[in-house]
Amino acid sequence: MKSIKLRLVIHYLPMIMFTIIASIIFKLFTSVTDTIVFTTDVSGYISVFFLSITLLIGPFNLIFRRKNPLSTDIRRDIGIYGGILAVIHSVVGLFAHLRGRPWLYFVKETETGFVINLDNFGIANYTGLLATLFIILLVAISNNASITALKASKWKTLQRTSYLMFILVIVHSIYYREVLPEKEILTSIYMFIIALIIVIQLVGMRLKLAKG
């Protein structure tokens, strides 16, 4: 395992630089002027990019017949960084559309009180919230202490919730595409990446089963 200082330099610094460059490009090619909306959008897109990489490392190791250890520094750090961006996306996003009334992301106000919001907007937000909770769990156990405390089998079981998290992200993306059609182009690119990940994951699963 590399030292934290070395990981900050060779893992986190390049990811931060990528985030800055991607944010500048996003700013140049979109008409978003609101800082909160911009931060919500860019943190969401970039977080999915990094979280996607963590789901691709395992299948690629199988495809190219490389060792596929329980945990590696690079996969762990990419997951942590992507998870931090996802949490930023979720927190800042609560102030993107309903300024000062974040509860309306999840409930509707009626004459008699509040009811659970189950339209496209509500489903998008509930799936996003659940995905964020799973991400927080995954980030929290992304360390050697958790592997030691939980033991490898239990830790791996919890780690597999990353697949459920990603399904929730897909649903979240689909429903927000319906709610915010003006983001259709970016969301389409987003969905293409997700589809690519699913295909590669299936290839990896097939190779794993064939390997026995």
Regions found by a protein language model. Give the residues of each.
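Membrane-embedded alpha-helical bundles that constitute the cytochrome b-like, heme-associated redox core
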Residues: M1-G212
